[in-house]
Amino acid sequence: MKNLILIACFFITFSAKAQNLSLTKIWETNELPVPESVLVSTGQHTLYVSLIDGAGNIKDGLGGIAILNADGTIKDRNWVKGLHAPKGMAIYNNILYVADLDVVYGIDTASANIIKTIKVPDAVFLNDIAINSRGIVFVSDTRTNKIHRIENNESAVYLDNVKAANGLKFINEQLYVLSDSQLLLIGHQKNRKLIAEGLEKSGDGLEVLKNGDFIVSCWAGIIYHIKPDGTKHKLLDVQGKMNTADIAYDARKRILYVPTFNGNSVVAYQVNFN
């Protein structure tokens, strides 16, 4: 009997470790002009969506931020207007930080007013944002291959030679970054540890699951499930049909939100743990 219990426990453990994911589409919201990034606001049960509404590298004043309800209905299409090419977002102390080409905006979530405009010297294509527990902002520049650090509204280069630096995420006070076709962990001494490599296209959005696995999107239309040991498989491959830009994940609901960029929509997928 004891042996049977041990065998059963082995298979349960093996199954958990071998667990794969799949996606089931829940809803899609259209008529969102060039959505680049989605951010879950758990307290308000809403989604922030950065809208480029034009070219991703031009200061044209067409960009903005929309708010969706949790069911995908549009709460406020024009919550913030007059930005250029807004991309990655993060919230700290009720301030929404938004990367926009060469500046980072701080937007008061209660009033929708821009209360901070932080210039990032020599920046060209600021892309994603992550904020640590101390409120220090980190922002990637995909074109200059750098990660910048913003503290007390002052910007400085934190790390350079990070090829096509894009998606950022703090996990247990450690910074992870998508660098071209790789997922890297940046140590406290700025040493780099390779977590995964061989992404078919350059990485864009980065999210983490409760079990420590990652979900990674590639702008070209691929979404991966990546395990801490670097093994990966495709959850979605829609290349040539739509983009999969800077994703967001609601761990409580197990829902993945995907901005489709040129598809002008946001798609919600249920994440199934098989």
What are these regions (language model features)?
Residues 32-44, 61-62, 80-94, 121-137, ...:
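Beta-rich, blade/repeat-based domains predominating
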Residues 50, 99, 140, 178, ...:
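Residue-level marker for isolated small/hydroxyl-bearing positions within beta-strands
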Residues 22-29, 73-80, 113-119, 154-160, ...:
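A short beta-strand motif characteristic of beta-propeller blades
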Residues 95-150:
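Hydrophobic alpha-helical segments and helix pairs
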Residues 53-57, 103, 144-145, 182-184, ...:
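Short glycine/acidic-enriched loop and turn motifs that connect beta-strands
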Residues 1-23:
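Bacterial Sec-dependent N-terminal signal peptides
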Residues 50-72:
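Beta-propeller domains
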Residues 68-72, 108-113, 150-154, 187-191, ...:
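Short loop/turn segments that connect beta-strands within beta-propeller blades
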